[in-house]
């Protein structure tokens, strides 16, 4: 059975709706995968080879790689926040306005490109090729829903 990323995230967000930062979200995501019995490796390092320009070859990492139902899946995470100061379930959250939405979108697109290269280059984890990748973008900033225009 294929991994249902939407169902997994929905289930995770029912347990916890707010995170202090991107690392907090990554840890909770990783723990939920572990609870389900999956093998996970946060900050999975790999050698990215550039066949056209060998000097561009370098060591890179993915936020998370998991072995899920015999399928190797890579994950990249982005958590972009608007200002929020609230007590939720007895826990105080203070999120800062990150702004620069254009840079946030660029970072997401860079992650998509990295995942595409990882899959194309047959990167392996536990002797299995990474065959699927997800960029998980989480935000409380409604500005990301409005889209972008270029002025000038």
Feature-to-residue mapping (PLM):
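Interdomain/boundary linker segments immediately adjacent to catalytic/signaling cores
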Residues: 1-35
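A structural signal for isolated positions on well-ordered beta-strands in alpha/beta enzyme cores
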Residues: 41, 73, 133-136
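Active-site beta-strand-loop-beta-strand hairpin of nuclease catalytic cores
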Residues: 62-77, 82-84
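Catalytic cores of nucleic-acid endonucleases
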Residues: 79-146, 151
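Short, well-structured alpha-helical interface segments that form or flank functional binding sites
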Residues: 20, 24, 28, 59, ...
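A short acidic/basic microdomain associated with nuclease active sites
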Residues: 33-65
